[in-house]
Design a protein with these regions (language model features):
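Structural signature of tandem-repeat unit edges
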Residues: 4-18, 28-49, 55-74, 83-97, ...
Length: 215
C-alpha cells in the first residue's frame, strides 16, 4: 500500500502473519488501523490505531490518530512516515528504541512529549523534541522545537520535513550536526549559530540548507 495517499483506514484480518516494514509507507491520509482480535501475530491493542507486533511490543505502523500504548517498547523506522495530520505524539516510559526515521516528513507535528519515567529518552524543558538522555543527542525535532542548551549533537534527518518553522537557534554545546538534519525545511530562513561553529561541523548540511538560506 506504499504511496496510497487516499487510504484513510485499514483492517488487518486474522490470517495475516507477515507485513513488510514499508507496507504502508507514505499513506499520508491514514487515520485508522484495526487488527482483528483473533490475529496472533499483530494487534491494535486498546484501539490505539497502530499496527503492533504482539510478541515484541514493536509499533510497526502508526497513523494520524495513533496513541502509543504504554507497553510498546520499540518504534520502527518509517512507522509514522508522511503522517501529515499527526500534530502531537506522546512517548511512553516503556519505549526503549526509536528509529531515527520513525517520524520522517510529519509536516504537521508540533508537540513531542516523553513520559518522565522513560530512562532512555526525554523531552527536557518542554523542548518539543526527542532527546537520547545518555548522549544528549537530539534525534527527532518538530515545528515547535527549541533545542536545549545541553544538547551536544543533532542526528541525521532530525528535522526532516519540518516545513513550518522559520528560524532555529543552535546552542553552543552542539558539536555535531548530522547529514540532512534540515532536509525539506522549506520555510527555514535563518539559523543562529554559536561562535564555536566550524565549517566541518556545517559541511554535512550545507547542501540541504543552500536552497533556503543565503549561504
Amino acid at each position: 500500500f506504499s504511496n496510497c495517499s487516499a487510504l484513510t483506514g485499514i483492517e488487518i484480518p486474522v490470517n495475516v502473519v507477515n507485513i513488510g516494514r514499508t507496507a504502508f509507507e507514505s499513506c499520508s491520509a491514514l487515520a485508522s488501523i484495526i487488527v482483528d482480535e483473533g490475529n496472533t501475530v499483530y494487534d491494535s491493542r486498546g484501539n490505539c490505531n497502530a499496527l503492533i507486533e504482539t510478541v515484541t511490543n514493536t509499533l510497526m505502523r502508526g497513523c494520524d490518530n495513533t496513541i502509543i500504548p504504554d507497553d510498546v517498547t520499540v518504534i520502527n523506522g518509517f512507522a509514522f512516515n508522511r503522517c501529515s495530520g499527526l500534530t502531537s505524539i506522546r512517548i511512553p516510559a516503556s519505549v526503549t528504541k526509536i528509529a531515527i526515521d520513525a517520524f520522517h516528513r510529519c509536516i504537521g507535528l508540533t508537540s513531542i512529549i516523553v513520559d518522565e519515567g522513560n530512562t532512555v529518552y526525554d523531552s527536557r524543558g518542554n523542548c518539543n523534541a526527542l532527546i537520547e538522555t545518555a548522549t544528549n543527542r537530539l534525534i527527532i525535532g518538530c515545528n515547535n522545537t527549541i533545542i536545549p542548551d545541553d544538547v551536544t549533537s543533532i542526528s541525521d534527518y532530525a528535522f526532516y520535513g519540518c516545513n513550518a518553522f522559520e528560524s532555529i537557534i543552535i546552542p553552543s554545546g552542539v558539536t555535531t550536526i548530522g547529514q540532512n538534519a534540515f532536509e525539506e525545511c522549506i520555510s527555514l530562513e535563518s539559523i543562529e549559530l554559536p561562535e564555536s561553529t566550524t565549517f566541518s561541523m556545517l559541511r554535512p548540511v550545507m547542501a540541504t540548507l543552500r536552497p533556503y538560506l543565503a549561504l
